[in-house]
């Protein structure tokens, strides 16, 4: 998705610029619009539209970032040059725009802190307090071998994440690992652990290779559509941090 970490809240208000440019060829998204038939698609904008209208987009168009209300057809999902994030069909375009504004307003400070951690070469474990500042629910970031890269929790509200480790190791206990692996084989979404704990899974891949998974446990607050959008956004940003200079202390990656 181009709905990634180069977008700031201010970008959606028409102000260009971002704190992290790992690729000089990458430009910021500069606006969020409700799609209307007949308009000329513009690059680097987010278009909000119903799934049934995707077929009406001209065959020749710039690279587009779309929020589809309802699940698109397989043909649309595979169409080149269209990055699509689809959401539940009960949402209206106006609700999506409102969610986007809230999302990026909430995300701005989070992104700046991620940027700082990246530039300081901090390990993934340094993410824990940053994640807690954005997500009320416990969140677990795991690597390709189901090792725990980051663990965020409010100990006053929940101790479940404390019990997710396999003994005193840095790996998930088998029951959590099995549940998370099943969720990561597909596109993620809402699932639950063998203990019956609901969670939201967002797998992050590069060229079909699983890099890591983000798991938000629903133990303090119900999972929301905003959580899903924000986790997708966060996952792609963390992937870009890996590409720049984020150090994974477990796997011994070196600064690039």
Model-derived features with residue positions:
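Alpha-helical/coil-rich non-catalytic "connector" segments in signaling and regulatory proteins
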Residues: 1-254
